[in-house]
Amino acid sequence: GDWSSDVCSSDLAACNSAPPAPPFKPIAETKDLMELVMERQADIVWGATGTIITAEGVEERSPKTEEDWIAVKAAAVNLVETGNLLMLAPRAQDGDRWMQNVQKMMGQGEKMIAAIDRKDTKAMFDVGSDLYDTCTNCHMHYMPEIKDLYR
C-alpha cells in the first residue's frame, strides 16, 4: 500500500482516541446526597421568596442584596448539578422513571436559575412550587415510607 495513507490513518486513530476518563469514586450514598446537599440547597431556594403571615404582621421574602442573589443562585446551580450525580451509578435507581424524575428536577432548577438571573421573584416562587411538586412525586415513588408526611 501507499505509505502516506497508512501514516494518515494511524495518525487519525491516535487523534480520535480520547484519554481515559479519570476514576469516578462516589463517597455519598443517595440518601446522604439528598439530605446533605439536595435538601439544604432546596431549602435555600424555597426560602428565598414568599409571604409569611404571623401575629406580628406580614413579611415578604425576597433576596435583598447582591450577596443574597448570589447565594440563592449558587443553591439552584448546586441542585441542578447534583442531579447529574443522581444519574450516575450506583445512585441511579433505574434507567426510566428515576432518570425522568431527575431530569424534570434539573429542568425546574434551570428555570429557577433563569428566574434568579432576571431577579423575577414571582417566577422564582412559581418555579419553586413546581420544583417542590417534582421532588414530592419522586419521593412518593422511591420513598414510600414517607407518604404519610404528605397527607
Q: What does each model-found stretch correspond to?
A:
Residues D2-S9:
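Short, small-residue-biased leader/transition segments that mark boundaries at the very start
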Residues A14-P19, T136-H139:
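Bacterial signal peptide processing site
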Residues A18-Y132, E145-R151:
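Extracytoplasmic c-type cytochrome modules immediately beyond a signal peptide or single-pass transmembrane anchor
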Residues Y142:
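Cys/His-rich microdomains that often coordinate metals
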